[in-house]
Amino acid sequence: MNFTTQMDAAKKGIITKEMKVVSQKEGVDVEILRELVAEGKIVIPANKNHKSLDAQGVGQGLKTKINVNLGISKDCANIDMELEKVKTAIEMKAEAIMDLSSYGKTEEFRKRIVEMCSVMIGTVPIYDAVGFYDKELSDISPEEFLAVVEKHAQDGVDFMTIHAGINRETAKVFKRNKRLTNIVSRGGSLLYAWMELNNKENPFYEYYDKVLDICARYDVTISLGDACRPGSINDSTDASQIKELITLGELTKRAWEKNVQVIVEGPGHMSLNEIAANMQLEKKLCHGAPFYVLGPLVTDIAPGYDHITSAIGGAIAAANGADFLCYVTPAEHLRLPNLEDMKEGIIASKIAAHAADVSNNIKGAKEWDYKMSEARKELNWEKMFDLAIDPEKARRYRRESTPEHEDTCTMCGKMCAVRNMNKVMEGKNINILREED
């Protein structure tokens, strides 16, 4: 193999097997795809050690992808439940899974996911550092942080969130500009605390070249974490967020110089009117790198319904340039999601992604809607169920409320507009009060 990473291959004019897979899935010319990978505008996260991977592309002109977060915590350490979530997420056609386990020795769980998963897998190595070394945060050395990054890369993860943008300069801006909700990124808050406790630079920023060397060796895509993402709509598009975004743009170019693929992570909580501008800012400041957003959640008043606040923001974000949506569940801000929470979060996120793809004229997106509308016109219930984003729920609703006549539903009955227009357009009579002949 005469290339190190997908980006290195693309720059050399080499079309990899992963590029061919993505080209076929997306209906995009493979040479155009290769050029965009070379430019950093598309990434194909594909760790050399992830042998079961069915490659996906993320970025310009491709379908919007969704990620599902899962993993164990100290309060909820049921590995079997998390593995069941993995299986369900794959069945529901999520394109990526992130293991955000934050308790104990996570290696076994991570390795099992890599072995069983055909989808992209991501991690946040700093979450693992405390459990990996069984040390308090402030006692972990920069070299030890880097060793955890290498371990995750060896284990086969395709992308890693690295919060390298929260350096001492960004921290100064944060201190000068008061926020309502401070730093809500878990990884970002841990690194900020480490910097304050040790009076040192963020090790992922100070030794960024070493991080890139690890990523290049295994072809891990670096997902540049947004430690200063807004945790409330009050804090959105503030000095800390923008200062960090500028730094992430600089780090993006440094990664590309070493042929490391880059995703940039984004907000967060943000009111509707700010989303489009934020997408444009990221694309400009980060040189067209794919944008991976958590939401954005468009209001802060809906605990229990944040899959909805997130889907609203995610649809607008993806319609304006975001490439990758991190799902949010109804359990957000409340608890570790259970299986049903996860399912609702996936469906909400997939709806947002598809709505954006329709808006962006992504190949095949409108055709799906056309087929559904065609099935509705035909009152072909089975076809509607098969085309539904959640066939199980659609079938259950129909089954739980059976109409008198098969060609109606219990909402309108014989006043069904579709049924009656079909008959009138065919020159037939309609009977609403009496039985049909």
UniProtKB/Swiss-Prot annotation:
Cofactor binding: number and manner: Binds 1 [4Fe-4S] cluster per subunit. The cluster is coordinated with 3 cysteines and an exchangeable S-adenosyl-L-methionine.
Lineage: Bacteria, Bacillati, Bacillota, Clostridia, Eubacteriales
GO molecular function ontology, one term from the record: zinc ion binding
Homology family: Belongs to the ThiC family.
Known pathway: Cofactor biosynthesis; thiamine diphosphate biosynthesis
Residues involved in substrate binding: 69, 98, 127, 163, 185-187, 226-229, 265, 292
One GO location term (cellular component): cytosol
Keywords: 4Fe-4S, Iron, Iron-sulfur, Lyase, Metal-binding, S-adenosyl-L-methionine, Thiamine biosynthesis, Zinc
Chain residues that bind [4Fe-4S] cluster: 409, 412, 416
EC primary class: lyase
Annotated residues for binding of Zn(2+): 269, 333
Role noted for this protein: Catalyzes the synthesis of the hydroxymethylpyrimidine phosphate (HMP-P) moiety of thiamine from aminoimidazole ribotide (AIR) in a radical S-adenosyl-L-methionine (SAM)-dependent reaction.
Keyword S-adenosyl-L-methionine among UniProt keywords: yes
Reactions listed under catalytic activity: 5-amino-1-(5-phospho-beta-D-ribosyl)imidazole + S-adenosyl-L-methionine = 4-amino-2-methyl-5-(phosphooxymethyl)pyrimidine + CO + 5'-deoxyadenosine + formate + L-methionine + 3 H(+)
Name of the protein: Phosphomethylpyrimidine synthase
Cofactor(s) named in the record: [4Fe-4S] cluster
Entry EC number(s): 4.1.99.17
UniProt-listed GO biological process terms: thiamine biosynthetic process; thiamine diphosphate biosynthetic process
